[in-house]
Amino acid sequence: MMTKPNQRGGRQKSDTQNNLVLNCKMKMYDDAGSDSDDGFDLRQEIARSAFADMCHDWERNQKYDQALQLTIGRLHAAGREAHVLDIGTGSGLLSMMAVRAGADSVVACEAFRPMADCAERVMAANGFGADRIRLIKKRSTEVRVGPGLDMERKANVLVTELFDTELIGEGAIATYRHALEHLLEPGCLTIPHSATVYAQLVECPLAVSWQVPKILGNADGDVLLRTPEDVVDCRGSSAVFDVQLSQLPETSFNALSEPVSVFGFEWSNREELEVKRHSKKPVEIIRGGIPQAVFMWWDLKMDLEGSVLLSCAPFWAHPDFSSLKESNKNPTIPEQNLIPWRDHWMQAIYFLPYTKNTLIPGQRVNLDSFHDEFSLWFGLESPNLPPTHCSCGFHIAYSRSRIGQLNDGLRNKRSLNYLEQILDKSSTVLVIGDGSLLGVAIGALGVSHVYLLEPGQLSRTCMESYIRFNGLKNVSILSDLAELDASQRAAISHVYGEPYFGSAILPWENAIQFGALVKQIRPVLPPKVTFIPHSFSVHAVPVEFLDLHKINAPLGTCEGFDLSAMDRMIEEHSNETDSPVEAQPLWEYPSFALGTPSKLLSLPLSQDLPETQLWQGEFQLTQNPEKCNGIAVWADWHMDGSGSPKTTISTGPLESTADGEQPIRWNANWRQGVHLVKKAPRDGVVKWSVKFNGQLRACYFQFE
């Protein structure tokens, strides 16, 4: 079945992640069966809940299981019963583990009704009826304790997974504080027992390129655009910047310090679970550089003694990395992928207040760390630093990946070189798209005039700031093309788009939207207008993902429990809502090419897009077809009709994928399209078809 590409956007990596996972505290929906848009969103969220990798995280599952056995065994050895409460049970996995470990009673609560109903089916399928696990379909804060109520008695063991990349972003502090006061006995044991947050001071120009727009210049070194000071000084978005730090090129950052622990959370101690804290840690500088950011991660001590440790550290700081490297028998796996993989808990980047000061080896500085109920932030020698928020508007208008695109040196070089060749002082340029700094920079090339078509207020305000700061008198901003009179429209010689639109999710959607707008405005423009880009194409390559495919893999059995009921629920809702091509930042997910890239389609942008068109073909898997678990898809825009690489902007691989021996190097400023293959092709052939619908402005993909 062909379905429309996903319009939800998924996890934006450079912005925020909102995956629903199997054992988290989920949003309550009042109308699970609605056919409205909210009903569609609900079905999609159910579908995505198992597409997170939670139950495929074997280390996480095994260490929760070990901690339950140790904790329950500890109580029994002391002659005490073990009464377990599982908050946010999700699939019911942790509750079933608790029963298997010998718990005397288990109460599970789950507020998300469709998931709670599914957990009930999972428990029954594994032989755990209401006499073994009492399932309460409520939020933990609504649970009542007492004879004849939700819980007959308070629990003395709490097992839960309330964490996200930022540790406390899902409300762990408030949930634990409530449970400790109302649902748990004094002196109770919690699984996990405690958490530690770590920070590492770094200089990382790559990360900064996702935070601050650089000065824009041409090949001759002429400065075309400078960045307004309020944008440079702004601390940026308050949204967590969750990243697979292990996939950062080692040459892309300079570790100025060793990792240091900055916060500890003892989950069984209500008094120590403060909503707001500040810590000051002296840090010794081990390498010189400018302090630009902090890399953050955390670990969990799963049991009271701390004998079971679950770490979310990147590979260079992971406690098991050395032993895993020594025991590795597969030389094709990059060493940064030897540590256990997970996508539900990653690491995060926090930007420090802007400075040009360089730290030197041996210097000691104070790292200030802060947290409130939901978030973290960091500073240097800044004991009164307020929480991060955008004060300039730029980081609200544009995502981090968009800022990365604006700073893409190769993209800017090719675009400006071409624009300088075809434009002159008589040119009048209409720029279509959101937040095009290249469009603003055209004004500095000496053209007659530039009109920026910016319907969105936020983006329009940001572009106005750039125009004022750079003193560009020949650049005007329009909210609607109707603001131009007939003589002004008649003077337009070129229409330019990067193309970029904030509403686009998959790369080619930018080009399609540009083409659709061109079709609308063409009748009011001079007949000999030049349109840039000239055309766009979509390409794909069959790949082997090392890990990404796990987000779409069926659960089957997990730690000896049958979770097929979960699989059936997920599949049912996925068939209704999910697209065969989803957006993912593939630089974070290593993949190997298993064949030669194919061009799936090509469409003109200098002419009207067709009403409909169909393309068909097949991939020949030249290497290890049995390993094929995905198709990676990307778009290229072509500024002219020459087909030259020098006039092509690509959102895909940075170099040839021909050898297949090394992971593909992806453009880190774009999310590419991904189709996850459920079953590897036996004959080494994957058939594909793409249908373009001009009226709906969409491409429909099918892979067989």
Swiss-Prot record:
Assigned keywords, A-Z: Methyltransferase, Repeat, S-adenosyl-L-methionine, Transferase
Principal EC category: transferase
Tagged with keyword Oxidoreductase: no
Biased composition annotated in UniProt, kind: Polar residues: 644-654
Molecular function per GO: histone methyltransferase activity; protein-arginine omega-N symmetric methyltransferase activity
Transmembrane spans: none
GO BP, sorted A to Z: peptidyl-arginine methylation
Disulfide bonds: none
Region (Disordered): 642-661
EC annotation from Swiss-Prot or TrEMBL: 2.1.1.-
PROSITE patterns documented for this protein: SAM_MT_PRMT
SAM-dependent MTase PRMT-type domain ranges (all copies): 30-377, 380-704
Keyword Methyltransferase included in the entry's annotation: yes
InterPro entries in the record: Arg_MeTrfase (IPR025799), MeTrfase_PRMT7 (IPR014644), PRMT_dom (IPR055135), SAM-dependent_MTases_sf (IPR029063)
Family under the similarity heading: Belongs to the class I-like SAM-binding methyltransferase superfamily. Protein arginine N-methyltransferase family. PRMT7 subfamily.
Main function: Essential arginine methyltransferase that can both catalyze the formation of omega-N monomethylarginine (MMA) and symmetrical dimethylarginine (sDMA). Specifically mediates the symmetrical dimethylation of arginine residues in the small nuclear ribonucleoproteins SmD1 and SmD3.
Protein name: Protein arginine N-methyltransferase 7
Organism in which the protein naturally occurs: Culex quinquefasciatus
Gene: Art7
